[in-house]
Structures are given as structure tokens and as C-alpha cells.
Curated annotation (Swiss-Prot):
Necessary cofactors: FMN
Reaction(s) this enzyme catalyzes, per UniProt: glycolate + O2 = glyoxylate + H2O2
Cofactor binding note: Binds 1 FMN per subunit.
Single Gene Ontology BP annotation: oxidative photosynthetic carbon pathway
Residues at which FMN binds: 78-80, 107, 128-130, 156, 231, 253, 286-290, 309-310
Binding site residues for glyoxylate: Y25, Y130, R165, H255, R258
Protein's gene: GO1
Disulfide pairings: none
EC number: 1.1.3.15
Native source species: Zea mays
One Pfam family of this chain: FMN_dh
Protein name in the entry: Glycolate oxidase 1
PANTHER family reported in the protein's UniProt record: 2-HYDROXYACID OXIDASE 1, S -2-HYDROXY-ACID OXIDASE-RELATED
Length: 369
């Protein structure tokens, strides 16, 4: 194996290393996987308008997220059950994110608990939350995240039911017997039963609350002072509702194309959300980020930062903590290079004028009518 030169190469290594059920769980999307492909392809249709002859000898990639200073606008998205990828699981990811000076989001469905992740040492961490039918479970989880020093809640709002992930159905996906969903240990919610289709789909149907609505976003604010990021917004309408309901931020997300197929790529939905937010709250994006150029494009469209998920899991599977560190370093280095070659020395200098989107190309064509 030669030197790894980009983030995508880790996926091929992960595929060789992991059991099929684990790899398919991480890699697959919903139904036809159109959105899964589109999350990547939409980035490739956005082009650069680089500015030249600008002194780029010093480049500052630092930024602030919810008041926390981080080294770069690239953060770790929540991904479930990381010990299926590597025995160190979320511990390794937490250490790599902290070493890179960025934020890690821990999944509700992690195979390490909030307390265990906190024990890895200092670091800025967010907690991704699913709202369970039993609100006492939710309250307990939020309390534990607060006590463990987590700084924000990323509330997933696009999963009243689990998307139809056909690979998981074929594989009859279930959490391996030696692992548990550590945040639910002792609650009878830590294990996943074998099912006729996907064990996770059955688990979600049994535990996650389908009645979840904006009133629950309000309720969460009554039980915690932590800022709440609404994760899973794709439209202007829901952006305005997020603002009206006191969200601290929005994550434009289609759940890694694992929920509703044929929704737009997140990078395609981003500008609509940013415009509707009117600067009243920060807008982040996840889904399909594999290059530093992708990070730049997202920021040019108004994102305050990006979250990466699958690249973290695949690099974790391939090389543990060192793999995750390497992915974060490669993305950082590529992003820095993109800034330099585009003529930007700070994030504030990245503007909409630095890119051309499909809609820009269309509006530039004079109408024949």
C-alpha cells in the first residue's frame, strides 16, 4: 500500500478490512442511493473564480463556533457505533479531534458513553440527540452530556422513522454481540435484537418518538441551557421555524443520504437555508465533504463550517486514531491550499464571488423569450 494521498482512499481500505455487515452499514444510503451519489457529485458542479496576485503568505483558518475557538471550520459529525470500525472506537475519534483543535460530535448511538469520551481528556464536544418515546431517558442523556462537559446538543430531526437502507435489510444488520449502545447501558435500550429485516430499523421503530415536533425543541430548551443545533434542515420554511423556535444553529443535513432518497444534495440546499436564516443563526453543513475544495465551496455559499462523517469512520477502520488524525490533517491542508490559490487569507475573505454554481451558469444565459 503506497502513501495515502486523499480522504477517499481510506474507504477502499475500510472495505477490505471490515466485515461486510459493518462496512455496508457505514457506506450505504437509502433506497436507490441517488442522494448518496448526488451528495458528492453536486460539489463537482461548483467551480472556482480564483483571485490572483494577493499576498497569501499567511493564512488563518481559525474560526469560532457557538463561542468556541477552533483551528479550522472542519468538524467531526456524529456517526454511530464506531467500535464496529475499530476497537478504540469513539475514544480514538475524540483524541484525534481534540489534537486537531476541532469539535467532535458524539452520536446517541455510540459504542462509548459520554463519560468515557469525556475521560479521553480536554476537547470541545457536542452531543447528538435522538428523542426517545420515554422523555425521562432523553432528560437523563442530556444531564449526563452536560455533566461530562459537552458544549451543545445536535438534535437530529430527520428520523421519525429509519430510512430504508436496503444493504442493512439484506444483511439483517444488528450490533455485534460484544458491543452495546453505551449511553443506554442498564436501560434495556443498549442492545439491539436480531430482526427479520434491519435490527436498527426495528430498534428505532420501538424507541424513537415519531411525534417529535417543534414543541419538543421548545421543551428541550426548558431542560437544558446548552445551545441546540437543529440537524436535518433542507428548506427555507424549516429554517424560519428553527429561528422562531430558538435554535442556536442549523446543520443542513440529509443524514448522509440515509433517510429520504431524492432529496437534494446538502451543498445544493445550503444557499436556500443560508438566505432564509438571514444571519440570525449560524448554518453548518454535512454530507459529501471529501476535499478541502468542498470545504471552501460550502463556506463560499454561506456555511459557518462543515461536519465530516464517513471519512472519519473509514479512516478509523483503516488506521485507528492515526487514521482519523490523518483525514483531519489532509482536509485542513487541502483547504489551506484552496484558500491560497483562490486568494483568501482568512475565512472572512471567502465570498460568494469566489465560486460559480449551476444556477449562476443558468442565470447568465440570456433568455430567448
Amino acid at each position: 500500500m503506497g502513501e495515502i494521498t486523499n480522504v477517499m482512499e481510506y474507504q477502499a481500505i475500510a472495505k477490505q478490512k471490515l466485515p461486510k455487515m459493518a462496512y455496508d452499514y457505514y457506506a450505504s444510503g437509502a433506497e436507490d442511493e441517488w442522494t448518496l451519489q448526488e451528495n458528492r457529485e453536486a460539489f463537482s458542479r461548483i467551480l472556482f473564480r480564483p483571485r490572483i496576485l494577493i499576498d497569501v503568505s499567511k493564512i488563518d483558518m481559525t474560526t469560532t463556533v457557538l463561542g468556541f475557538k477552533i483551528s479550522m471550520p472542519i468538524m467531526v459529525a456524529p456517526t454511530a457505533m464506531q467500535k464496529m470500525a475499530h476497537p478504540d472506537g469513539e475514544y480514538a475519534t475524540a483524541r484525534a479531534a481534540a489534537a486537531a483543535g476541532t469539535i467532535m460530535t458524539l452520536s446517541s448511538w455510540a459504542t462509548s458513553s459520554v463519560e468515557e469520551v469525556a475521560s479521553t481528556g480536554p476537547g470541545i464536544r457536542f452531543f447528538q440527540l435522538y428523542v426517545y418515546k420515554d422523555r425521562k431517558v432523553v432528560e437523563q442523556l442530556v444531564r449526563r452530556a452536560e455533566r461530562a462537559g459537552f458544549k451543545a446538543i445536535a438534535l437530529t430531526v430527520d428520523t421519525p422513522r429509519l430510512g430504508r437502507r436496503e444493504a442493512d435489510i439484506k444483511n439483517r444488520f444488528v450490533l455485534p454481540p460484544h458491543l452495546t449502545l453505551k449511553n443506554f447501558e442498564g436501560l434495556d435500550l443498549g442492545k439491539m435484537d436480531q430482526a427479520a429485516d434491519s435490527g436498527l430499523a426495528s430498534y428505532v421503530a420501538g424507541q424513537v418518538d415519531r411525534t417529535l415536533s417543534w414543541k419538543d425543541v421548545k421543551w428541550l430548551q426548558t431542560i437544558t441551557t446548552l445551545p441546540i443545533l437543529v440537524k436535518g434542515v433542507l428548506t427555507a420554511e424549516d429554517t424560519r421555524l428553527a429561528v422562531a423556535n430558538g435554535a442556536a444553529g442549523i446543520i443542513v443535513s440529509n443524514h448522509g443520504a440515509r433517510q429520504l432518497d431524492y432529496v437534494p444534495a446538502t451543498i445544493s440546499a445550503l444557499e436556500e437555508v443560508v438566505k432564509a436564516a438571514r444571519g440570525q443563526l449560524p448554518v453548518f453543513v454535512d454530507g459529501g465533504v471529501r476535499r478541502g475544495t468542498d470545504v471552501f465551496k460550502a463556506l463560499a455559499l454561506g456555511a459557518a463550517g462543515v461536519f465530516v462523517g464517513r471519512p472519519v469512520v473509514f479512516s478509523l477502520a483503516a488506521a485507528g486514531e492515526a487514521g482519523v488524525s490523518n483525514v483531519l490533517r489532509m482536509l485542513r491542508d487541502e483547504f489551506e491550499l484552496t484558500m491560497a490559490l483562490s486568494g483568501c487569507t482568512s475565512l472572512a475573505e471567502i465570498t460568494r464571488k469566489h465560486i460559480i454554481t449551476e444556477s449562476d451558469k443558468l442565470s447568465a444565459i440570456p433568455s430567448r423569450l
